[in-house]
Amino acid sequence: DENEWLDVEKLPMFDIEYLFIKIRAVSVGETVKLNLTCQEEQCNGTGEVTVNLDDIQCTKPTGVEPKIMITDELGVVLRYPDWNLMEGVQKIDSNQQPIEMLKACITEIFDSESVYDADDISKKELSEFVDNLTFPQIEKLGEYFDDMPKVFYDASYKCNTCGKEQSRTLEGLQSFF
């Protein structure tokens, strides 16, 4: 329905970052100047790069599906983290952030006989489920998040100290402001 409002807080983080960059480009200006550190080991210099915000792109997922089998019989369905989730995760201990994000992004757990909606599972049961995952299983689930779209820009610059031409891919909103 065209009269429905878009709930920004439910958009995936990468969509919000992309929208923010586009709004910033229109409201304040299309370019931002950044000083990037030299990548040479013995150099402490920097290089300036002017980023045209209209040139920032969003990576496309390479095909890691949200439905992931963690054993032959057991699987989960994941979703991308949204604004509310990322805001909440920032408030907890950094060591716990990845696990808490994983718990919050599980939408379903299923086996060969049943599908369990995460909203119908208690927090305690969900915590026990995630706590019992092996490291290889957690790594497999992590591939979904590693494949998540990201805003990025390929920057080229010259160090003002050693003069070396360099390039670096900037990722995530924090890279641009």
Located regions from the model:
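Long C-terminal interaction/binding lobes of large macromolecular proteins
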Residues: D1-F177
